[in-house]
């Protein structure tokens, strides 16, 4: 379900302050991103915000976020009009429930991954993305039998969205024959984006984060390719918001 915000006046207004983000400073992560053709396309920005996050009214938060000068000056793939504030944003709420990678056990159960190896298939193209194995079919080819491995609820998990970015890669991508590297680095990116907390009264962990898939920023940004994505991840107890951007950069 996509939501279109409007610029309604509320009693609160958020301010945002740029913070250093070290997710992309990890040498091994950058090496694998280079292998997957993502080293120049994937970006992560972090900001502090000043007042309590109202999860019942994400519209106001997102409008204030993308109208902030600090945020506008930090994003890589949005063409904001100077001195023109946004009044509308189309976005889709995502779920952040996963604390393990068991979402991807389905790949083994459905024989897309066998003993850690990704099952190969005849090569085809989808939106200039090379589809040469059944994993990529399961991610983006809606008319394939592999696509039904993940249901709609699975696909609206932030964990799934991050996994898809890494698996599909960029135009100059050296794909993996085995699944483990995709799982390991999805876990790394997810772990460093969301806020995991422990319940006060029991020894269990939960994710204290809210995530949003930004579909369109009025006259400034539109997601028109499977790899053109922007996710906003709000960590209320830390008053930190992370913005993950990726673009399909054409090499030829």
Swiss-Prot record:
Keywords: Cell projection, Cytoplasm, Cytoskeleton. GO terms for cellular component: cytoplasm; cytoskeleton; motile cilium. Its main location: cytoplasm. The keyword Cytoplasm applies. It holds the Pfam family CFAP300. Disruption phenotype: RNAi-mediated knockdown of the protein causes reduced swimming motility and velocity. Display a reduction in the cilia beating frequency and an altered cilia waveform. Show absence of the outer and inner dynein arms. It comes from the Eukaryota. One of its GO terms (biological process) is inner dynein arm assembly. It is found in: Cytoplasm; Cytoplasm, Cytoskeleton, Cilium axoneme. Belongs to the CFAP300 family. Cilium- and flagellum-specific protein that plays a role in axonemal structure organization and motility. Plays a role in outer and inner axonemal dynein arm assembly. PANTHER family: CILIA- AND FLAGELLA-ASSOCIATED PROTEIN 300. This is Cilia- and flagella-associated protein 300. The lineage of its organism: Eukaryota, Sar, Alveolata, Ciliophora, Intramacronucleata.
